[in-house]
């Protein structure tokens, strides 16, 4: 089974479409939060995720958008209320099984308080191995990680909409996991909003 992973789309529908293109054929799509901005909704991004029956979780931006602080942002008349309700109904974490592999989806960390930025060089990265899962997937930092820690593979696909990782020349990125071979591919691709050359 091929599982596609995106995170931190931040309203960039073209970035999400391009991620789906470079992933190739996938069986499941996972979104690790921050599909939107804290004060900006995207009908296009929510529609694509819903149409693809993606397994979505909230990030810190959804938490603000759907809190009292985001009430003015939610009142914009152009927002599709069915799509907003779809995104609002998502949890902040998910445990799922694909084939025989157990996946834990979080936006920042599996431990409380949520919100810590765990970069690839962080000593806290090893804490992900405490999870009862074969794969722990997270976003939040916009920085790619693929690391085996004990029996757990930790994956951060980077950002499919707001590139900030200098290690890949600030390209957008996504990931694909093959649950039969445990192969993880992180795929870089250009952000068409910023043409090169």
Question: Where on the chain are the PLM-derived regions?
Answer:
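Active-site-proximal beta-strand elements of phosphoester/diester hydrolases
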Residues: 2-10, 102-109, 153-158, 186
């Amino acid at each position: 089974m091929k599982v596609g992973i995106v995170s931190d789309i931040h309203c960039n529908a073209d970035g999400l479409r391009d991620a789906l293109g470079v992933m190739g054929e996938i069986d499941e799509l996972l979104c690790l939060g921050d599909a939107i901005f804290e004060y900006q909704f995207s009908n296009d991004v929510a529609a694509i995720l819903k149409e693809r029956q993606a397994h979505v979780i909230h990030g810190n931006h959804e938490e603000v958008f759907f809190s009292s602080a985001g009430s003015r942002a939610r009142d914009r008349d152009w927002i599709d209320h069915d799509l907003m309700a779809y995104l609002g109904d998502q949890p902040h974490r998910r445990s799922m099984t694909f084939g025989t592999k157990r996946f834990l989806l979080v936006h920042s960390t599996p431990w409380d308080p949520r919100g810590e930025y765990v970069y690839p060089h962080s000593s806290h990265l090893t804490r992900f191995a405490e999870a009862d899962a074969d794969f722990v997937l997270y976003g939040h930092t916009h920085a790619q990680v693929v690391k085996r820690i004990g029996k757990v593979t930790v994956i951060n696909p980077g950002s499919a909409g707001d590139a900030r990782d200098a290690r890949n020349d600030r390209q957008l990125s996504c990931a694909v996991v093959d649950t039969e071979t445990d192969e993880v591919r992180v795929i870089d691709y250009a952000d068409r909003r910023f043409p090169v050359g």
